[in-house]
Amino acid sequence: MFKKLFGQLQRIGKALMLPVAILPAAGLLLAIGTAMQGESLQHYLPFIQNGGIQSVAEMMTGAGGIIFDNLPMIFAMGVAIGLASGDGVAAIAAFVGYLVMNKTMGAFLHVSPDNVNDAASGYASVLGIPTLQTGVFGGIIIGALAAWCYNKFYNISLPSYLGFFAGKRFVPIMMATTSFILAFPMAWIWPSIQTGLNAFSEGLLDSNTGLAVFLFGFIKRLLIPFGLHHIFHAPFWFEFGAWKNAAGEMIHGDQRIFIEQIREGSKLTAGKFMQGEFPVMMFGLPAAALAIYHTAKPENKKVVAGLMGSAALTSFLTGITEPLEFSFLFVAPVLFFVHAILDGLSFLILYLLNVHLGYTFSGGFIDYVLLGVLPNKTQWWLVIPVGVVYAFIYYFVFRFLILKFKYKTPGREDKQAQFTNSSASELPFNVLKAMGGEENIKHLDACITRLRVEVKEKGKVDVAGLKALGASGVLEVGNNMQAIFGPKSDQIKHDMSLIMKGEITKPQETTVTEEESEEVVHIERASEVNIYAPGNGQVIPLSEVPDQVFAQKMMGDGVGFIPADGKIVAPFDGTVKTIFPTKHAIGLESDQGLELLIHIGIDTVKLNGEGFESFVETDDRVHKGQVLMQIDLDYITAHAPSTVTPLIITNLEDRQLSVEDVKDVTAEQLIIKVIDDK
């Protein structure tokens, strides 16, 4: 029961991220537009007082403001998409339902343009419809209902004479009906709910605001590992608290009030549930990253410097803290608990200093400048001394606790030597052991690049052991582990499956003498190998491939290729070494011994071969320009995250990769030179 509820809450939390992701763009427009109209910036840049520039500034402010004015509708559509696996039909259904519910509530309650502006009534004009104000909560309810209608009716069958309305077309019809019915209980009970929310928020904020902001920061931080923080902070940002703007409209929610006050140039009173992030994200966590680097083992410091440096810069600039927090969360929970306490105290300190700062994305430097420094409506400079003090506290507390309790933070892990000499026959047994054993495996799968395992308890997984076994990287997404073993991943998965079924047993240990050692054949490498485009399309840097396994070169170096049509051809003369059963990837070896992986699309293993037609088989001889595969590009575009096709050289070794300065290419056009200087 609890696990099911927890899973549902996680899904809702993730669904909220889509509408929230729109806010930074809106905030950027609004903040820059407002700053350009403000006296502070005009004092330093008098030329922006030009009439044309001011007109642009007004348009930017209006463009950003319209997003915040219609947040409930955006949340309705965003939540629907998030809970319906990204299908746009759910968003259309949510839009239809939102209109129907508001129009019906307005008619039922006799709301008119004459009484809609009476703030005490709880009415509002929504998309020009005089109705009951349900705010973001109303949008979330409609979004969840639209997702339910989609998941329930998207594949419904109807009699042949009604066949046009079958399937997904039936979803908006059902949504219009259900939202019409929903409008009546909403009109009846929502005023009481809104009154209760207002009373709760007023009591929370007026009775002991300091305690409230501390607990908000503390609890929100503790919920991050569970992915529930989005659900927790949504009421505070979008519903709790009330403020009447110049037009007489009642604005609810700390973030919405803050943005409205920035837009109007009013005195700032909001930001209590956002401002505490700035000292932590801009100063505290980067200092914690420095402590982790300084406590790493000397031989690991170079690697840790890159890891922690990137995470610290991300936290400082954007306020995205997960890469840094998850580096110590599981190995040192005490550090995370201390971090949560310090986060709560940061909210309390800035509240006591009467600072009012907010953001549209997170508490990083970008939002700090746009919504704090440029508007110049609060004592934004106080964040700096508070942040400097926080940097010292984070650094010395983290350093002391890491050394005192010998936490295995990045760079301090124990080496796992017991698996490094695994033979091919022992490897699946050892990988299974590193995954926590057979009893810890919930679901087992693989693609041509990685082993995908859903485990019951992530704490039982030996990540260092997996790397020692040959995994070039291990990704953790919830309880889903992805171990990057390259092309042998599918074989490991196959063998692990047989082991779990009891069909194969661990081989006996044998002693190998020197006389039995294998003969090593040395192949002379060519000084230069050319790789040509595998079709018509575009070439992009590997770093832009939307999959960090490829983008971070865990599989090898290369480029990304975006096919323009469905024909995939051989990029050189050579041999087909591997074709994955689902046909989404093919491994080739050139006549000069260079190994190339062509991975068509991202996460296309889940398509189970649908949309792929192969014209070659393993061990076939191929020539440059020969058709290897025909793909249904429309199908892949609709059912996979991306059609970007990584071209990965898996045995580059000490050779140099030279990518041609090209973008739009045709089949058989030179795109890569691999040069051997030896």
Curated annotation (Swiss-Prot):
The gene is ptsG. PROSITE patterns: PTS_EIIA_TYPE_1, PTS_EIIA_TYPE_1_HIS, PTS_EIIB_TYPE_1, PTS_EIIB_TYPE_1_CYS, PTS_EIIC_TYPE_1. It is a multi-pass membrane protein. The active site is at C447 (phosphocysteine intermediate), H599 (tele-phosphohistidine intermediate). Keywords: Cell membrane, Kinase, Membrane, Phosphotransferase system, Sugar transport, Transferase, Transmembrane, Transmembrane helix, Transport. This is PTS system glucose-specific EIICBA component. Residues 3-414 form the PTS EIIC type-1 domain. It holds the Pfam family PTS_EIIC. GO terms for biological process: D-glucose transmembrane transport; phosphoenolpyruvate-dependent sugar phosphotransferase system. It comes from Staphylococcus saprophyticus subsp. saprophyticus (strain ATCC 15305 / DSM 20229 / NCIMB 8711 / NCTC 7292 / S-41). Residues 425-506 form the PTS EIIB type-1 domain. It is found in: Cell membrane. The phosphoenolpyruvate-dependent sugar phosphotransferase system (sugar PTS), a major carbohydrate active transport system, catalyzes the phosphorylation of incoming sugar substrates concomitantly with their translocation across the cell membrane. This system is involved in glucose transport. Its EC number is 2.7.1.199. It is an enzyme of class 2 (transferase). The EIIC domain forms the PTS system translocation channel and contains the specific substrate-binding site.
